[in-house]
Amino acid sequence: MAPYSPPSSRGIARPVISAALLTLGALTLSACGSEDTAASVDSGAAATTTQVTDATGTKVKVPAAPERVVALSEMDLDASLTLGVEPVGLTAGRGQKGAPRYLADQAKSIPVVGAVTGPDIEKVVKAKPDVILAGQLADEQVLAQLRKVAPTVVTIDGTKDWKKSLELTGTVLGRSDEAEKFLAEYGTKAASLRTDLGSQAGASVSVARYSAKGTAVMQQGVFISDVLKDLGFERPGIQDDKGEGHSTPLSDENLDEIDGDWLFIGSLDAGTDADLLAELAKKPAYQQLGAVRDEHATVVDGTRWTSLGGAQAAVSVLDDIRKAMVK
């Protein structure tokens, strides 16, 4: 699998709510947000629709070939761009003002319509979507408001499995073939890397994120753990357990929890947090880690490794691991 180049493009807290909600009654007449909703209207003619089952089991009628997609999670944005569809709205990435750093160039012209904490309904309305990819949004009141704007599909289930989400997004966007092709190429690339790891296959790999709040490790049940599992790696200490949240904070006294045969550590912010990470590397407690002493510690882009993740992020992780571990 060559370095990823996306196909040509076409054009969970309560959200910010404003006077734009007054327009939703009119929008409801032309939106198709559930199995009981009429097909959407385009230039006076009924558009072709298809029914999909989202990550919650809800059946949703969506346009057969959506052209105005709003992506309400990093994984939705990653998937859409991977499949050759440029959204008309996105939510800012974790710790970012806009798209996740690794997608910034591809998404530089896409308006921000919300944050990790939730969508801004007014901005979603202004984007005039014909379908909304709602990520892992679980607030039923928010979902009801979004469904008045356009058909809304929850794309991420409780497992947060990026592969399942990509397949569902491919179905919603009419790009199932592209999704299947990507997953096949990813599988081939992962299998090749696993073979080339040689004696390092089965090593314990630690993944940590550093910020002004301190150090956190990535446990089971998140994106990066699934990618590492594809490669057959072990996880050290508490990282082999399922965490309660997206990441698990550590006190300075427990810094040894980030140790392993190999350590990959990153930050979300390329500015302040990256500077803090550079300072951490100078501390004796960090320098005493086995992975550091063995020169098995690598600084990575935290937006790829330690956030919600997605298809392009997964390929980047494989590339980083190959560069660090295959000699």
Give the residues covered by each predicted segment.
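Extracytoplasmic substrate-binding proteins
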Residues: 141-212, 308-327
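Sec-dependent bacterial lipoprotein signal peptides
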Residues: 1-30
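Short, low-complexity, disordered segments immediately C-terminal to signal peptides
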Residues: 15-23, 32-51
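A short, structured surface patch at a secondary-structure boundary
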Residues: 68, 76-123
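Structured C-terminal subdomain patch of bacterial secreted/periplasmic proteins
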Residues: 261-327
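Proline-aspartate-enriched helix->loop->beta-strand connector
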Residues: 128-134, 151, 255, 260-263
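Extracytoplasmic ligand-binding site segments that recognize negatively charged/polar headgroups
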Residues: 96-99, 139-141, 157-168, 202-227, ...
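Basic- and aromatic-lined ligand-binding clefts that recognize polyanionic substrates
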Residues: 68-80, 180-238, 243
